[in-house]
């Protein structure tokens, strides 16, 4: 507030989260274009709840509300956010990065002669549905004995997923990796047959837009997603 009060050259305010805008005095925004980005999980609070009212009051200060997908826009409208203000701008991805020969070699060594080669790149969250994929692979192993599944990421569910893999005796089929560079990630995507991330709605958490699907497409890899 103090900065906006004293800095008269500011013409536009862009908030990356509704909470970033919540405490700004509306009187300081009257001669400025104000935009706020929204994501599904951040606004998904029951209509009439205290958090929903805070979201609505805060977003009433804006000229434009930037949604990352049509899914998020529909969710926002269902939560009584003004549809007239919402503009959909899909997130972008980094410019295409050709995997290095060295990283392609690393990827081929990991997958060896496996088929099909499955991959997921995401946080290990409940809504990403890794556990269902793992249990499905247990059954697919009977049909595809050389199947391989690479999970790249980290998150709260990591230990639970590794425990599940051990219980199902899939340690030689399912591989976990994290903290890899973007070029190696591109190589793994490039060498995979299918990118799989059948996301679900879990409590307030929803998949508003999956950038990983676009990254897989950049490498010519088909995807399987969820309807939620």
Predicted regions and their residues:
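Acidic donor-binding loop of glycosyltransferase active sites
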Residues: 190-206, 221-222
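Carbohydrate-associated surface elements
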Residues: 71, 92
């Amino acid at each position: 507030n103090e900065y906006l009060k004293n800095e008269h050259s500011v013409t536009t305010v862009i908030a990356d989260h509704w909470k970033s805008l919540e405490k700004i005095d509306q009187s300081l925004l009257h001669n400025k274009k104000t935009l706020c980005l929204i994501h599904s999980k951040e606004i998904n609070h029951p209509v009439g709840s205290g958090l929903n009212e805070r979201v609505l009051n805060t977003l009433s200060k804006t000229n434009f509300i930037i949604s990352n997908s049509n899914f998020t826009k529909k969710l926002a409208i269902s939560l009584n956010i003004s549809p007239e203000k919402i503009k959909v701008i899909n997130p972008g991805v980094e410019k295409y990065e050709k995997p290095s020969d060295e990283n392609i070699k690393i990827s081929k060594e990991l997958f060896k002669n496996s088929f099909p080669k499955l991959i997921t790149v995401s946080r290990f969250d409940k809504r990403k549905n890794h556990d269902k994929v793992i249990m499905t692979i247990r059954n697919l192993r009977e049909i595809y004995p050389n199947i391989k599944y690479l999970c790249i990421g980290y998150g709260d569910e990591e230990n639970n997923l590794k425990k599940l893999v051990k219980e199902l005796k899939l340690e030689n089929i399912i591989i976990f990796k994290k903290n890899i560079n973007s070029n190696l990630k591109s190589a793994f995507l490039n060498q995979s047959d299918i990118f799989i991330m059948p996301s679900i709605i879990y409590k307030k958490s929803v998949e508003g837009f999956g950038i990983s699907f676009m990254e897989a497409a950049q490498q010519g890899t088909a995807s399987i997603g969820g309807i939620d």
